[in-house]
A protein has these predicted regions:
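Membrane-lumen/periplasm interface segments of specific transmembrane helices
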Residues: 30, 35, 201-280, 322
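Short hydrophobic/aromatic helix or loop-helix immediately within or flanking a transmembrane segment
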Residues: 54-77, 81-85
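Membrane-embedded, lumen/periplasm-facing catalytic core of multi-pass transferases
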Residues: 373-436
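Membrane-interface alpha helices of multi-pass inner-membrane proteins
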Residues: 153-169, 174, 180
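Membrane-interface transmembrane helices that cradle and orient dolichyl/undecaprenyl
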Residues: 139-154, 188-192
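Signature aromatic-anchored transmembrane alpha helix within multi-pass, membrane-resident enzymes
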Residues: 154, 277, 351-380
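Perimembrane helix-loop-helix junctions
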Residues: 175-209
Length: 438
């Protein structure tokens, strides 16, 4: 713990904070330096060199303002650095909230978060990545303030959640899953009575509902102010109560996408990522049962049922947007809440010691699997950026060749001629070398 003074105020820096902060940057650079120090545009980037994409029209009334922090330009290093900073603060807040003191576990937490597939997907849209990860921070801060500030924490949490949703609505799911994790911790680790936990947790429900209502109110004012309506894109214009059949379909979509992002859309496959994530889910289940028995939570029926329900509801919470409109389609960009399952595993691993054989096996396997995931994710990040680089250069080469051939035609008049392109150019990335235009 280090202390320094700014004016008359003493600032305390805990070692745990510094470990989380530094790890985020080290692993973040290992995973994403390829992206930060190269210009790798995608389709959206071409017309968003100066901007953050659609804002008010998609209900993202704070996105434009959040993008101003790093200017309105697509700046890979600047936007990437701010993104890493936001993630590192998230790690610090969560280590405080869930009382993670073990430095090794903090390293794993930071490394998993910063290399998660949603972060890679966000960096594909680098012109708005920093704003999206600011939404991640605000959603986390909403739960943290509700937890630690007694008097005005819930209200402050509502404001943070509303602004997180004002950047990207999908980040509300981060707050939902964090509340579920805290409920699990209360029952399984702190061993609170059911009614006592309910009294304590009502403020989190108030924060979630209040934040959503505040977001909706500001959205309504924004729509009136600019005289616009929400489009049908992603079901944004059709939010509301659905039919029972639609809720069933939403649950099916949720379970499919939950398996998909973990690499298990067709069950456990012979792929490293699929096997590692299957091991994570298995270990979470085994450690959860072990803690229920060891801490005698099973003697408190309501507490046990509530903790089981909270675990089962994690996928629903992570994909809650599915249950607000039948037209929602989830993308990796929207799935940051799923990475919190690894936080749940870390929280439970901290309750295991190295004394009994079963505890040793569970803890050792858990640490090994998480280390494997970090390694795999870092490699996978670089592979993703490598493919982005190939795709970009391939596209540029094809476009230049087409343009040259057009300009060589006798009918070509000037640069203002319009060109109609019909058909498809067969140039899959894996065939890059043999499909280059000649």
């Amino acid at each position: 713990m280090k202390t320094f003074t700014i004016g008359k105020k003493k600032i305390v820096l805990k070692e745990e904070w510094m470990v989380g902060f530094i790890t985020t940057w080290i692993v973040g650079l290992l995973a994403h330096a390829y992206r930060f120090f190269n210009f790798l545009p995608i389709w959206d980037s071409i017309y968003n060199f100066t901007g953050v994409g659609s804002t008010y029209t998609l209900g993202r009334w704070f996105l434009g303002y959040a993008g101003l922090i790093t200017s309105m330009f697509d700046l890979p290093w600047v936007n990437g650095a701010f993104s890493l900073f936001y993630i590192s603060i998230v790690v610090i807040l969560l280590t405080e909230m869930f009382e993670i003191k073990n430095k090794g576990m903090i390293v794993l937490c930071a490394a998993i978060f910063v290399s998660f597939p949603t972060v890679v997907s966000s960096f594909a849209y680098m012109y708005t990545a920093d704003a999206y990860l600011l939404a991640f921070l605000l959603a986390t801060l909403a739960v943290y303030l509700t937890w630690c500030v007694k008097k005005w924490g819930t209200i402050a949490g509502m404001v943070c959640l509303a602004f997180a949703m004002g950047i990207y609505q999908a980040y509300a799911t981060v707050a939902i899953v964090l509340v579920l994790l805290y409920i699990i911790r209360q029952f399984v680790i702190e061993k609170l009575d059911f009614l006592e936990a309910v009294r304590k947790d009502l403020k989190y429900l108030g924060m979630l509902v209040g934040g959503a209502v505040l977001y909706a109110v500001i959205l309504k004012i924004t729509l009136i102010r600019y005289n616009i309506t929400l489009p049908g894109y992603q079901g944004i214009g059709a939010l509301g109560i659905m039919s029972l059949g639609q809720y069933k379909a939403a649950l099916q979509k949720t379970l499919y996408h939950f398996r998909l992002i973990l690499g298990m859309e067709h069950g456990v496959e012979k792929r490293v990522y699929s096997i590692l994530n299957a091991a994570v889910l298995l270990l979470i289940g085994l450690i959860f049962i072990y803690l229920l028995i060891r801490n005698q939570v099973y003697k408190k029926k309501l507490s046990m049922l509530a903790s089981i329900a909270a675990v089962c509801l994690i996928p629903v919470g992570a994909y809650f947007i599915n249950f607000t409109s039948p037209d929602v389609q989830y993308y990796t960009l929207m799935e940051m809440a799923v990475c919190l399952i690894y936080l749940l595993m870390i929280i439970m691993l901290l309750q295991l010691d190295w004394k009994t054989w079963i505890s040793k096996i569970l803890k050792g396997c858990g640490i090994f699997v998480l280390c494997g995931l970090v390694y795999y994710n870092v490699i996978n990040c670089n592979i993703a950026y490598f493919n982005m680089n190939l795709s970009y250069h391939k596209s540029i080469s094809i476009a230049e060749d087409v343009l040259q051939r057009i300009e060589q035609m006798d009918e070509f008049q000037n640069q203002h001629d319009k060109v109609v392109i019909m058909g498809d150019y067969n140039c899959a990335t894996e065939n890059l070398q043999i499909m280059m235009p000649s």
